[in-house]
């Protein structure tokens, strides 16, 4: 019996896979629990259309991320903070301050996608990575200066 999985099933397959199982397993467990549907020609056609639409949507999201990366690649930030006499920062500069500076420049970026590798605790030049998409990221240089 050929079925289309509606969710991941351990030791069988992943969501939207077309797999062959024994009739009893399909009719008595997978289909009644909603984990699968029978792979009729119409169901296969609907699956193909759904996958095509999803691929188109993911492509659009990736293009939007690439456009945003193109805007951000030439951006250089300057972050002013309170500094002690020795040049160390009170606290640290994090992705929150970087997101705020980007917003001041007109780029709305969620702070959760900004990665700062090391703790920024001194005045100097650093780099942050903005992960816009799983395949698209951009490195933004920023400088921390005394206020």
Swiss-Prot record:
Keyword RNA-binding: yes
PANTHER family: 50S RIBOSOMAL PROTEIN L9
Species for this entry: Phocaeicola vulgatus (strain ATCC 8482 / DSM 1447 / JCM 5826 / CCUG 4940 / NBRC 14291 / NCTC 11154)
Pfam family, one: Ribosomal_L9_C
Function: Binds to the 23S rRNA.
GO biological process: translation
Protein name per its UniProtKB record: Large ribosomal subunit protein bL9
InterPro entries: Ribosomal_bL9, Ribosomal_bL9/RNase_H1_N, Ribosomal_bL9_bac/chp, Ribosomal_bL9_C, Ribosomal_bL9_C_sf, Ribosomal_bL9_N, Ribosomal_bL9_N_sf
An annotated GO cellular component: ribonucleoprotein complex
Gene Ontology MF terms: rRNA binding; structural constituent of ribosome
Keyword annotations: Ribonucleoprotein, Ribosomal protein, RNA-binding, rRNA-binding
Protein family according to the UniProt entry: Belongs to the bacterial ribosomal protein bL9 family.
Entry keyword annotation includes Lyase: no
């Amino acid at each position: 019996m050929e079925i289309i999985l509606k969710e991941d099933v351990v030791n069988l397959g992943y969501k939207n896979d077309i797999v062959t199982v024994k009739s009893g397993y399909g009719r008595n467990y997978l289909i009644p629990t909603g984990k699968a549907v029978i792979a009729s020609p119409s169901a296969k056609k609907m699956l193909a259309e759904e996958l095509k639409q999803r691929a188109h949507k993911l492509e659009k999201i990736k293009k939007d991320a690439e456009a945003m990366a193109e805007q951000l690649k030439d951006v250089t930030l300057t972050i002013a903070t309170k500094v002690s006499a020795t040049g160390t920062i009170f606290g640290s500069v994090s992705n929150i301050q970087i997101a705020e500076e980007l917003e001041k420049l007109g780029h709305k970026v969620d702070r959760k996608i900004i990665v700062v590798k090391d703790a920024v605790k001194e005045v100097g030049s650093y780099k942050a990575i903005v992960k816009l998409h799983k395949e698209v990221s951009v490195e933004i240089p920023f400088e921390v200066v005394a206020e």
